């Protein structure tokens, strides 16, 4: 297994928080090229963890290794070159007067030549399907479109890791669906590691691996179908059951008993129901 991130015994405590720790001796590994969702209720420590990995927050104890580099004051900028972060509020991410200017901003800081910069900007805007909006101002865009521009800005710098810090939580259902599908496309087409910080179980179900945080500690990790099939853990952490599990349980309450292995498999449960209706 080739890990791109290793976190060992990470502890973080906010000032004036007493004995409460936002992160309490957290250790985890993230495989290169994978999509990992870090889930938990508000205050569970998931955003603190993401921002610690990117060097935006100085933790109290522990070690963070990103692609073979130990995070420190001397290496933080080397690590940030490898990571692109997309935050919750798209309005807080715009720094350019237009879409094109915003995507070019990071490239200008890297000293990229103008001709090459234009090619990169056009290419990434096409990838996120925003090439027809490059002269638009931020206030002329929807929330989902702004997040697409933020993703384009991240892709322009060719990161090895993309961290989505609650990046879909302020979007309407359609916008959320479009952004998650876009990230899924980018993940499938490129060797990019994706870390999604979320409390949206349906979003986390698309990932390869799920880590559940509760009160600063990891309480469960594994494949999404395994993790979200644990009703006791979901109750403890205040997370919702996936839609498929809700449907399965509702069928059982009505005296309809699908095979238990279909509880976390939406496509197979749908097919089973279709076959059941055809026999009726």
Swiss-Prot record:
Belongs to the ABC transporter superfamily. Energy-coupling factor EcfA family. Its main location: membrane. The keyword Lyase does not apply. Pfam families: ABC_tran (PF00005). One of its GO terms (cellular component) is ATP-binding cassette (ABC) transporter complex. InterPro entries: AAA+_ATPase, ABC_transporter-like_ATP-bd, ABC_transporter-like_CS, ABC_transpr_CbiO/EcfA_su, ECF_ABC_transporter_ATP-bd, EcfA_1, P-loop_NTPase. ATP binds at residues 40-47. ATP-binding (A) component of a common energy-coupling factor (ECF) ABC-transporter complex. Unlike classic ABC transporters this ECF transporter provides the energy necessary to transport a number of different substrates. GO terms for molecular function: ATP binding; ATP hydrolysis activity; ATPase-coupled transmembrane transporter activity. It is a peripheral membrane protein. This is Energy-coupling factor transporter ATP-binding protein EcfA. The lineage of its organism: Bacteria, Bacillati, Bacillota, Bacilli, Lactobacillales. Signal peptide: none annotated. Residues 5-240 form the ABC transporter domain. The keyword ATP-binding applies. It is found in: Cell membrane. Forms a stable energy-coupling factor (ECF) transporter complex composed of 2 membrane-embedded substrate-binding proteins (S component), 2 ATP-binding proteins (A component) and 2 transmembrane proteins (T component). Its EC number is 7.-.-.-. SUPFAM superfamilies: P-loop containing nucleoside triphosphate hydrolases.
